[in-house]
């Protein structure tokens, strides 16, 4: 089954917990802290596999989570990091944040990877907290949760040439005679229900990729017919071959067909209307077709189009069309990627972050937000008194009590920091 758009949820692995441990040596029952760190959680990674051509593998499973990191142990043994979860996608997969619609990645090359959800960092063991004024720390950190997000995957096929035109004009027949592609071919509309890719070999060392785009009709940009489901696959092509049924057997005017398809391209994406086009007047083997060629070809050539009368069924004129296409492609730039703004993302070190704490009262609850204090809360083991005391010292260091009092907090009020709720007490 061909699937070219899907939404999934991904989550990086939870970081492993650090451990509280002390050396047990002969004559030194409390020989100092030796608790190891927890391992980092695994990442969720998208990797391009050129053997795939659909997103169908994501149709029935929509939630993916990488392996969590392992906990630390005594003797300064750090936990193993969780295994990355690699999800294979076809070339041409575009990744969007499903909530913000932000373009995250455009994956086109075989083996190309993108980390779509980072694993959580492992918690530090108590050996990390030893210092001159704290020789026997009895607390460690819990691991951080992995990054979690919803993403939308869209497949935009990677092809040099796109075949466009009304249904039943001969696109599938053409790609079948010039490549090894074997699309379903029949004499009725919308026979082609998915794009077909074929490699056109001009010589042993020269070839290009052609995509047979399912038939477009008026209103395609709004989803009429097979519509915008397949228009996106034209976006990556460098060149379009516009196939027209010159026989008139369908009862339509060839010139009106040409205008209609180009209007749909422009309405869907203005850049498509300026994409170079070669016109193939197909089915010249049928009665009356050559007379129509004499009428239509001069009109299109006057507009600046290169026109080839062909018969995909008998292969007449096909060789000339394909070799001209190959020559023209040599002159056109290769632009595979969908443009996005360059962004430099700097993740500050946990210990060096400057905190900006905000306190807001919502529905009677005082909600505290701040990257650092929220992270400390997440990493605190509330079953460990020493860890809780350390958290209170951190919050006091950041003047949280003063900020809460400024907002009018009273004893017994609920204070929420990250996922945790506390009862305020002076």
From Swiss-Prot:
Residues 1-158 form the Obg domain. It is found in: Cytoplasm. GO terms for biological process: ribosome biogenesis. It holds the Pfam family MMR_HSR1. Keywords: Cytoplasm, GTP-binding, Hydrolase, Magnesium, Metal-binding, Nucleotide-binding. One of its GO terms (cellular component) is cytoplasm. Its EC number is 3.6.5.-. GO terms for molecular function: GTP binding; GTPase activity; magnesium ion binding. Mg(2+) binds at residues 172, 192. An essential GTPase which binds GTP, GDP and possibly (p)ppGpp with moderate affinity, with high nucleotide exchange rates and a fairly low GTP hydrolysis rate. Plays a role in control of the cell cycle, stress response, ribosome biogenesis and in those bacteria that undergo differentiation, in morphogenesis control. This is GTPase Obg. It comes from Halothermothrix orenii (strain H 168 / OCM 544 / DSM 9562). The gene is obg.
